[in-house]
Amino acid sequence: MTDVTIAVPVSVRFFAAAQHVAGTPAAELMLGPGATIADAIAELCGQSDEIALVLQKCSYLCDGVAVRDLRASLRPHQTLDVLPPFAGG
């Protein structure tokens, strides 16, 4: 039997300062099986030191639900929203 590795495609949407440092409003990640939200963030942080600094301060939504545990597993085709701190009214 062959070992089949299935990638986990995840959509990422960046907002405000996160979008600015990412240089794009959205990105697609291909993560390994069993990938967690922390793995997705680590993949994004690897793109630049600047984005890594911003992502440390962000909150995250996964399919519209606030992320409380970065160790939560991602399923294929989920959407991760990256929300930096907002100010104003």
Per-range role (PLM):
Residues 1-88:
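Ubiquitin-like/PB1-type beta-grasp interaction modules and other compact soluble beta-rich domains
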